[in-house]
Structures are given as C-alpha cells and as structure tokens.
A protein has these predicted regions:
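N-terminal catalytic cores of peptidoglycan-degrading enzymes
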Residues: 1-106
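Basic/polar, cationic surfaces and motifs that engage anionic cell-wall
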Residues: 2-9, 24-25, 106, 111, ...
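Residues immediately flanking
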Residues: 35-36, 117, 156
Length: 180
C-alpha cells in the first residue's frame, strides 16, 4: 500500500514542474543520495534552486552552458546549513537518477526517492546536513518500509561509471549511526 506521506514537514516547499506520476501501484523502495553545487564547489548560491524550479539563467556562469533545456529534479535538497527544500512530493516521480539500475531493476526514478546534498564528492559534508538528512531518512524509513538500510544508496551505486556522487567525502557510517 502506498503511503500518503507526500511532504516533509521540516522542508520548505518549492515550485517544480519536473516530475510526473510513478507507475501504478509502484512501491517506493529505494533512497538515493546525490550531491550538487552550482557552480561546482560554490555553496549558498541560488542556482541549484533555480535549476530545480526551471528558472536558471544558463548565461550566469560559463559552466552552466550544459544546463540549457535540462529538466531535472530531486525530491529534496539539503543546504550546507541544514535547511531542507522540497521540490517534488514523495508519492510522485522526481527526475534525479537518469539511466540507472538497482538490484536488477532499471529506471530507478520509478521506485526511489532522491535527496540532493549541497556539496561535491571530495568536500566534507556539514554536521547540519547529516542531522537534516538523518531526520528526513528516519521519517522516510517509517513511511516507506520497503526502504531498508541496504536500500539507501548513492547515485554512484545505481549509475556506476556515469556518476560518482555523493563521493568519497560522504560518511556512510555516520549516516547509519544517526538513523539507528
């Protein structure tokens, strides 16, 4: 049975149109951790929010040229200071995983929730981010029992060779200690 839980009460809701319905009767059974910063390695900018809300100015920085026309989203984005922005209700399919496979199944967006951390693969994440991520993860584990600890993965795990996030700087044991 699909949980009615759609919005995290500690998150600021943000407008986003880059999502659609999950396949009928699809059970949410995977949590995917990502990282993002725009420009890469710069924090506290409005550009990630602009990307997910579809208003990014692709001329604002030379590295944004590849973002022209890109339609991507995540369910949530956790900033460095720990604030959580939510773009897509959990019962809807966000467009975060791209070409992906987990446990023999393709199209991970169909059955996953995507959480973006503001960061890079090699920059340590903040204490506030781990706290916010653990609070959100605990809530998701309660609401979606098919998400088990072994089904909390990085983007690198579902798209190896294509993606590397959340990277070597992400402390998996720290997250799992916090969600016990």
């Amino acid at each position: 049975m699909m949980s009615e839980f759609s919005w995290f009460d500690m998150a600021q809701r943000r407008p986003c149109t880059f999502f659609d319905d999950r396949p009928e009767n699809e059970e949410i059974s995977l949590l995917v951790i990502h990282n993002i910063s725009l420009p890469a390695g710069e924090y506290g900018t409005p550009y990630v929010d602009d990307l997910f809300t579809g208003v990014i100015n692709c001329h604002a920085h030379p590295s944004f040229a590849d973002l022209e026309g890109l339609r991507v989203s995540a369910h949530c984005f956790i900033r460095r200071e720990g604030s959580v922005l939510q773009y897509v209700p959990f019962n809807k399919r966000a467009w975060h995983a791209g070409t992906s496979e987990f446990a023999g199944r393709n199209r991970c967006n169909d059955f996953s929730i995507g959480i973006e951390l503001e960061g890079t693969d090699d920059t340590p994440y903040t204490h506030a981010q781990y706290i916010a991520l653990s609070e959100l993860t605990r809530k998701l584990l309660c609401e979606f029992p098919a998400i088990t600890h072994d089904r909390i993965v990085g983007h690198c795990d579902i798209a190896p060779g294509r993606k590397t996030d959340p990277g070597a700087a992400f402390e998996w044991p720290r997250l799992f200690d916090l969600i016990k």
